[in-house]
Structure formats: C-alpha cells, structure tokens
Amino acid sequence: MAVDVYRGTSGIQLPVEVSAEIWQKIQDASVVMGLARRVPLSGAGVTYQEILEDPTPQFVGETDRKPVSNPTFAKKTLKGHKIAVVSTYSDEFRRDLPGLFNALVSRLPGALARTFDMAALHGVGAPAADFDDLSGATTASILNTTAGSVDAYAGFLAALGAVPTLNAWALSAQGEVAALSNRDVNGGAILNPNVLTNGSIGSILGRPVFRSGNAYLAGDAAAATLGIAGDWSKAVWGQVEGVSIDISDNPVYDADGDLITAGWQDNMIAVRAEIHVGFIADDSQFVRLLGAEPAQVA
C-alpha cells in the first residue's frame, strides 16, 4: 500500500540514540517546562501534600480553654504520561537521502513540546487523571478595542490583581501584539523591552514576558486565549528517563488495528519517539488572558 515517506519525500539516516540532544530541544521549545518548577519523577509517580489552610490561633483569657484549629490538606499525584509518535519511512529513503536526522532533531522536539504544552496550558488532549491543566483558570480580558488605548492595560492589571504573586507572563504572538498596541494610563508602553532576563522578550508590570505560540488557543470572537500568566512556582513538571527513540522493521498498525505497512516485507521501517512527562498545578494561581482572534489577511 502507499506510504507517506519514501525517497521522493526528503531526509537522512537516523542514528538510534539522539535522546540527549532532542530532550534539550524539547525543553527549549516548551514554555511550560521553561517556567514551571521541575522535580524528579519516578515511573511510579510522586504524591505531593499541599497545605490548604493553616491553623487559626486566637487570643485567650487567663484560665480560658485554648481553641482547637487544625490545618487542612490536599494531595496531588505527579505521574508520568506517555507522549508518542510513530513515523514510517522506506529503506531506500533511509539509505539514499540525507536530512532525516537533522529534520528529526529540529522538528520532533517542537512537536513533542507542543503536545505537552497544549495539554498543560489548555487541556487539549490531556490525560483524564493525574495530570492537571490550566484550562479552568480565571480569565482577564486584554481585548484591544482601540489601538493606543488603555484597554489591554486594564486587563493586565486585573490579572495581577487576581494573582498578586504572578511572576511571569507567557504570551502568544497575538498577545504580544495586544500589549504593544496599547498604552498604560501615563501613555507609556505596556511591554517594556528593556528588561530581558532568561530568554524573556521584556516585562509587563515588572514581570518577565516569554513568547510562545503554545500559549495561544483559538476561541469565539473576543474569547481566544492570547496568553497565560501566574505564579509558576505553583506548577510542577517532571520527566521519567529521557526521550526513547527506536527504529523497527516490524508491521505498523493504526489506532483501529488496520495495517499501515508490513515493515520488513514492504522494505519499510518505523521510527518511534516517546517521552514520559507529568504536570500538576494550582490553577487558582493562574490567569488566562483573553482577546480577539487575529484578523485574517485577504
């Protein structure tokens, strides 16, 4: 049967072990991995205890009975979940055409990172259990109703008011445009490009701004997500081992069990790449920044 990648496509032979280089590129491409707190993660997962409320002491008089007040707790389980993809190639493609290795290193990390970010930030494709996402975080509008106005500035202030410990903004290109095309109440720029730290593109209200297309999620009218902001110390991620890369000439099937290629019999190979990652967060410490869909160019 016809397959997607052969000598007429483009590429190069792939060494089996490219995990370290690919993993570094995944982290570089993921805004969540860059901002959230990274912790060690075993295959069995890790349970974190969270103190929700401290005991409440009171003044008491002489001989009066002391009040009883206990802390309240919650727990979250950080567990590794698999993100995987299988691509098929002809033996002739692998043998004759250079570039597959470079293409894998340059493109696969971004694809894996985007899958993780979209799940963590927006709940897109997220596992049903033991994996948090920020889709339910409170919202603030940075809708740019009038260019050069303070519309968006009010939204950024509202986000900071909702999460006073907010320590970073993750903005899509659309969110960056909203910030750049508005002003604060003194007529100054909202996005200050002069404060550049750790890969940020500037600062808003003294907090660093990081650009990522993964922070964008399409929505209706003025309800597109243009960015995510919050206290990123309240978000935790971990990885189990590194990136697993395998090459096989075994048959490959789709999700319905239908044969895609017979592998060795068809002179085809399959490249499987997977990572195991987990994410937990307190979504009450984050704000989704909403605005208009970008205008379509005719």
Feature-to-residue mapping (PLM):
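Short helix/loop capping segments that flank catalytic or ligand/cofactor-binding pockets
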Residues: 56-59, 97-98, 178-181, 188, ...
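Alpha-helical scaffold segments that mediate packing/assembly in large oligomeric complexes
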Residues: 74-77, 84-165, 297-298
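Assembly/oligomerization interface modules of large self-assembling protein complexes
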Residues: 2-83, 283-286
